[in-house]
From Swiss-Prot:
NCBIfam families: PRK05244.1-1. A GTPase-activating protein (GAP) that modifies Der/EngA GTPase function. May play a role in ribosome biogenesis. Belongs to the YihI family. One of its GO terms (molecular function) is GTPase activator activity. Residues 147-159 have a biased composition (Acidic residues). It comes from Escherichia coli O1:K1 / APEC. Residues 1-92, 146-169 are annotated as: Disordered. Residues 20-30, 160-169 have a biased composition (Basic and acidic residues). The gene is yihI. Keywords: GTPase activation, Ribosome biogenesis. InterPro entries: YihI. HAMAP family: GAP_YihI. This is Der GTPase-activating protein YihI.
Length: 169
């Protein structure tokens, strides 16, 4: 005779039993009931909120409707005029530092590049560029610098190079 096949199955791991429709419905109702309970309890604001976080030394619960105990003046008091403090002026930069700031200004560089490319600037942008360039010229004059110095140095270097070439031949 053949050994029964049910015995071989029972020795292995038992299959998980499937839940019936009634059990599934009951679990769904329980989940829905728990979901409805979320949030604060009704009347928690008037009752004082959390009762678990009360201090041990205080027997009477604190009424949340009672506000601040700071005194409020009921009479008309003279207004105290505050003395205006003069705004602290920006520290003056040295002429050299101001010149370096103007020369490395990104907005000025971008606008000058647009001008070199042939674009026209708005009146506001053009006036801003003019003011900054005038300030750069003024600072360079005060510091004794000029644009011509750079050009003359380049010309001097070219002449020296020419002289070296001529001497070498």
């Amino acid at each position: 005779m053949k050994p029964s096949s049910s015995n071989s199955r029972s020795k292995g791991h038992a299959k998980a039993r499937r839940k019936t429709r009634e059990e599934l419905d009951q679990e769904a109702r329980d989940r829905k009931r728990q979901k409805k309970r979320r949030g604060h309890a009704p009347g928690s604001r008037a009752a004082g909120g959390n009762t678990t976080s009360g201090s041990k030394g205080q027997n009477a619960p604190k009424d949340p409707r009672i506000g601040s105990k700071t005194p409020i003046p009921l009479g008309v008091a003279e207004k105290v005029t505050k003395q205006h403090k003069p705004k602290s002026e920006k520290p003056m930069l040295s002429l050299q530092a101001e010149l370096e700031l103007l020369e490395t200004d990104e907005r000025l560089d971008a606008l000058l590049e647009r001008l070199e490319a042939g674009e026209t600037l708005s009146a506001e942008e053009q006036s801003w560029v003019d003011v900054k360039l005038d300030r750069i010229d003024e600072l360079m004059q005060k510091l004794g610098l000029s644009y011509d110095d750079d050009e003359e140095e380049e010309e001097d270097e070219k002449q020296e190079d020419m002289m070296r070439l001529l001497r070498g031949n």
